[in-house]
């Protein structure tokens, strides 16, 4: 029996990146032997064990053979005779098929992963890559993480991914797996690479049709030099990732904010009147299909509905600002206003030539919200107030606080 460090921990160390969890593969053992050493079995589909002291995962070396459709149709063999090289061959990409012998530091790299790391190439290991449709999403997610390091996908891997999309393999992916890969991509610095990769291999229209529909929809060049709404969406996603690193909640809201532009009549192009309202339905549809957490869906709907109002904040009357805060449930969920402000700033800056633009509307919205939030029912003289009068008086007091918070010379955002 011998164990090797494998996968992401080895890859990230070679890239000089912070390593995540350590995963180990065990050669020459069976489940009974692992249990006798105190390892706790946790794997449902294949033998995985937790180390009795460190809690790290140790998986028996295994092979996988396709016997059905989709990503679950595999026969697993974890016999003690399975070699390390056989286990590494079943993995997705060469850069993930590198093992390290921790006793002497030797790298075991039978499929050229070290060279691909040096060349910054994401390459599949074998034709078996095509047997698991989830790997198309994993490739896109890896690009969201690795594109900033200069990585690209090997041409032969792109070709295989296109074929997988064309033959319908991706239709077997369940919503939870799509959401898992999408949400993880939103934690990286270049989530647009996730969308771009899927679009390149014709997979975006299968797994995220609401987003795919944005591509090819023109915007007014005076306000959107990038013109294409899909490209605007990519820019917004990357700006959001910079403004709120690792924040999936803000990332998802930014992803959904302009879905309505795909539904505006062609006769109005490149203008998109009412796209905020039109975007509510596809945002809800996408959220429900992927079984997105409710708080994600709620913020996405708020961003979709309110982003133009925030852009033109300086033109809104005090009572209109108060109504905006109420629609956001901002007095019970105060964190939403800062989140909305970030999404709107990403929208404003997600345009060619505006990536570093100042966005005072966001700070001003937070300032107005803070002024209104500071007023509560205890501050009112309630001697002569009863029932609904208390709520009405509180609303008026908060509107006065908004009015007293000052104004600024901000943009209108009318043409967004």
Curated annotation (Swiss-Prot):
Binding site for Mg(2+): 21, 23
Cofactor(s) listed in the protein's UniProt record: Mg(2+); Ni(2+)
A GO MF term: tRNA binding
EC number: 2.7.7.72, 3.1.3.-, 3.1.4.-
Source species, domain of life: Bacteria
Binding site for ATP: 8, 11, 91, 138, 141
Alphabetical list of InterPro entries matching this protein: CCA_bact (IPR012006), HD_domain (IPR006674), NT_sf (IPR043519), PolA_pol_head_dom (IPR002646), PolyA_RNA-bd (IPR032828), tRNA_CCA-adding_enzyme (IPR050124)
Residues that bind CTP: 8, 11, 91, 138, 141
Catalytic activity entry: a tRNA precursor + 2 CTP + ATP = a tRNA with a 3' CCA end + 3 diphosphate; a tRNA with a 3' CCA end + 2 CTP + ATP = a tRNA with a 3' CCACCA end + 3 diphosphate
Cofactor note text: Magnesium is required for nucleotidyltransferase activity.
CDD domains in alphabetical order: NT_ClassII-CCAase
Primary role: Catalyzes the addition and repair of the essential 3'-terminal CCA sequence in tRNAs without using a nucleic acid template. Adds these three nucleotides in the order of C, C, and A to the tRNA nucleotide-73, using CTP and ATP as substrates and producing inorganic pyrophosphate. tRNA 3'-terminal CCA addition is required both for tRNA processing and repair. Also involved in tRNA surveillance by mediating tandem CCA addition to generate a CCACCA at the 3' terminus of unstable tRNAs. While stable tRNAs receive only 3'-terminal CCA, unstable tRNAs are marked with CCACCA and rapidly degraded.
Subunit structure as annotated in this protein's UniProt entry: Monomer. Can also form homodimers and oligomers.
Extra facts: A single active site specifically recognizes both ATP and CTP and is responsible for their addition.
Family: Belongs to the tRNA nucleotidyltransferase/poly(A) polymerase family. Bacterial CCA-adding enzyme type 1 subfamily.
Entry remark concerning the domains of this protein: Comprises two domains: an N-terminal domain containing the nucleotidyltransferase activity and a C-terminal HD domain associated with both phosphodiesterase and phosphatase activities.
Protein name: Multifunctional CCA protein
Biological source species: Xylella fastidiosa (strain Temecula1 / ATCC 700964)
Source taxonomy: Bacteria, Pseudomonadati, Pseudomonadota, Gammaproteobacteria, Lysobacterales
């Amino acid at each position: 029996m011998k164990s090797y460090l494998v996968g992401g921990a080895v890859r990230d160390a070679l890239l000089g990146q912070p390593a995540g969890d350590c995963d180990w593969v065990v050669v020459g053992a069976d489940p009974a032997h692992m249990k006798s050493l105190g390892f706790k079995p946790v794997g449902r589909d294949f033998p995985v064990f937790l180390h009795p002291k460190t809690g790290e995962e140790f998986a028996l070396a295994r092979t996988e053979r396709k016997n059905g459709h989709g990503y679950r149709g595999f026969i697993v063999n974890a016999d003690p005779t399975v070699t390390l090289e056989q286990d590494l061959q079943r993995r997705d990409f060469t850069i993930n098929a590198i093992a390290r012998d921790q006793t002497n530091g030797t790298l075991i790299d039978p499929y050229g992963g070290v060279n691909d790391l040096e060349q910054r190439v994401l390459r599949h290991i074998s034709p078996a890559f095509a047997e698991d449709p989830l790997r198309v999403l994993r490739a896109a997610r890896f690009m969201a993480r690795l594109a900033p390091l200069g990585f690209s996908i090997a041409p032969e891997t792109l070709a295989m991914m296109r074929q997988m999309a064309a033959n319908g393999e991706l239709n077997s992916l369940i919503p939870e797996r799509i959401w898992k890969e999408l949400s993880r991509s939103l934690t990286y610095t270049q989530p647009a690479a996730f969308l771009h990769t899927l679009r390149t291999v014709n997979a975006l229209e299968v797994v995220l049709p609401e987003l795919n529909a944005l591509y090819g929809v023109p915007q007014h060049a005076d306000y959107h030099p990038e013109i294409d709404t899909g490209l605007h969406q990519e820019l917004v996603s990357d700006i959001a990732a910079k403004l709120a690193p690792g924040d999936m909640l803000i990332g998802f809201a930014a992803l959904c904010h302009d879905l309505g532009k795909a539904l505006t009549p062609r006769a109005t192009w490149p203008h998109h009147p009412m796209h905020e309202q039109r975007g509510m339905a596809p945002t809800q549809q996408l959220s429900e299909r992927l079984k997105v957490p409710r708080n994600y869906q709620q913020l996405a709907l708020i961003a979709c509905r309110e982003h133009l109002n925030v852009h033109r904040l300086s033109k809104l009357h005090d009572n209109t600002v108060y109504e905006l805060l109420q629609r956001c449930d901002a007095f019970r969920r105060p964190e939403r206003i800062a989140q909305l402000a970030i999404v709107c700033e990403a929208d404003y800056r997600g345009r060619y030539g505006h990536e570093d633009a100042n966005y005072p509307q966001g700070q001003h919205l937070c300032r107005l919200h803070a002024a209104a939030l500071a007023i509560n029912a205890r501050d009112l003289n309630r001697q002569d107030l009863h029932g609904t009068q208390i709520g009405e008086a509180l609303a008026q007091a908060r509107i006065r606080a908004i009015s007293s918070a000052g104004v600024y010379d901000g943009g209108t955002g009318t043409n967004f």
